[in-house]
Amino acid sequence: MGQNNSTPLSLTLDHWKDVRTRAHNLSVKIRKGKWQTFCSSEWPTFGVGWPPEGTFNLSVIFAVKRIVFQETGGHPDQVPYIVVWQDLAQSPPPWVPPSAKIAVVSSPENTRGPSAGRPSAPPRPPIYPATDDLLLLSEPPPYPAALPPPLAPPAVGPAPGQAPDSSDPEGPAAGTRSRRARSPADDSGPDSTVILPLRAIGPPAEPNGLVPLQYWPFSSADLYNWKSNHPSFSENPAGLTGLLESLMFSHQPTWDDCQQLLQILFTTEERERILLEARKNVLGDNGAPTQLENLINEAFPLNRPQWDYNTAAGRERLLVYRRTLVAGLKGAARRPTNLAKVREVLQGPAEPPSVFLERLMEAYRRYTPFDPSEEGQQAAVAMAFIGQSAPDIKKKLQRLEGLQDYSLQDLVREAEKVYHKRETEEERQEREKKEAEERERRRDRRQEKNLTRILAAVVSERGSRDRQTGNLSNRARKTPRDGRPPLDKDQCAYCKEKGHWARECPQKKNVREAKVLALDD
């Protein structure tokens, strides 16, 4: 150690890429600046013995973690950082010095000295028991002790200077609620990112017997991550309902784990609604919801039951409890009946029909007392799907022959055909451009036709006016020249006398007769 003055903090900063990978595996995000600030400035002020240079001492880490996770006066922004510190201490990477690893594999109660690189100090008693789960609300369940894991490698020996079995538990379920207190050499154990409260630990003891299960509780990091990444149940029930439904199927939580999930992820009012709805959905012997108090308490107890998950009866009880809890979640997610909310669910311009149908069915579940997956509700859902689809899909579906014989799946397939045949953005722009040009040409033609009609009307009106004034020829009307006044209707153009016209003028007749007499003579 004389040539190496590295501290736990400097080691983590020098290998920051590995530390960040650990955080990613734990589903949390950390930053290098805050990591250094919390370690050197924040945590030493908690008064639990955290040194500014950091430590891998589990008892000190648990003490800091207890303060960070306090309901009042806690530090939620520091949760990811202390969780990663704990993971580094419990599963140290290769770059942690051997002296630090010795302190890691020891239990917090048996840790005698400070971390490597610091002078020895008088041993201080442990502040908090190392086996306390920070988010546990009550004592561990009185489940029977799990069998020793047969898959553990027998060749792995104890660390130097350590008793063979003085600090290693017989398994993660043997008297502890922490799922990570295991030797770093145990590579056969579950990965820290996998959370399965009940896990198979070996083959059945009998040929047709049950596979033995071992208990591993949820980690605080995962509970924190679930709470942070999901909206509240009152705001969007689908998020937490889907999460718990998945957990019930894949993780097989115990009764205590279910209470922990309810306590962390839901408010008091939400928990009461969920439990009330769940007890309404307890099934009787006939498969219908029962109102018998004894059957309800037996299937969905409010107090911790004595169920052994390593027996067939206990597993069946847990299975019924989980199913009933999921039914309670779905029942509590329903709002007062409001069909107007269902009609507000419209398909988006680029939304696939299958996604739209899922949103529509979720609205039915939330705002109506009906189950849209039931056979009797298929027609109503189908009509809503057609009427609230995008205009092009709606037009296609309404033209289908024998529409009453189509199922929801058939309608979705027909809608998918229209959806996938839609033109691209470039094609749409080109089509709109051509349509605009065609509209412009039609408008020009209409304007030309209107102008032609106007000119024809003007010419026709002018000809009609000419006919009314007596000018029936194609010649232009003669207008008075040299300032001569026009003649009246009964005025003679020859003698300008009134009462006769020029062809009847007596003066003009006398002149013609005189000329004729002159020729005869």
From Swiss-Prot:
Entry superkingdom: Viruses
One of the protein's GO biological processes: viral budding via host ESCRT complex
Compositionally biased region (Basic and acidic residues): 420-451, 479-490
Record motif PPXY motif, residues: 140-143
Free-text description of this protein's post-translational modifications in UniProt: RNA-binding phosphoprotein p12 is phosphorylated on serine residues.
Gene Ontology molecular-function annotations: RNA binding; structural constituent of virion; zinc ion binding
InterPro entries reported in the protein's UniProt record: G_retro_matrix (IPR000840), G_retro_matrix_sf (IPR036946), Gag_P30 (IPR003036), Retrov_capsid_N (IPR008919), Retroviral_Gag-Pol_poly (IPR050462), Retrovr_matrix (IPR010999), Znf_CCHC (IPR001878), Znf_CCHC_sf (IPR036875)
Annotated site residues (Cleavage) in this chain: 128-129, 196-197, 455-456
SMART domains: ZnF_C2HC
Motif (PTAP/PSAP motif): 119-122
Region annotation Disordered: where it falls in the sequence: 106-197, 420-490
KW Isomerase (keyword) present: no
Protein name, per record: Gag polyprotein
Organism in which the protein naturally occurs: Woolly monkey sarcoma virus
Organism phylogeny: Viruses, Riboviria, Pararnavirae, Artverviricota, Revtraviricetes
Gene name for this UniProt entry: gag
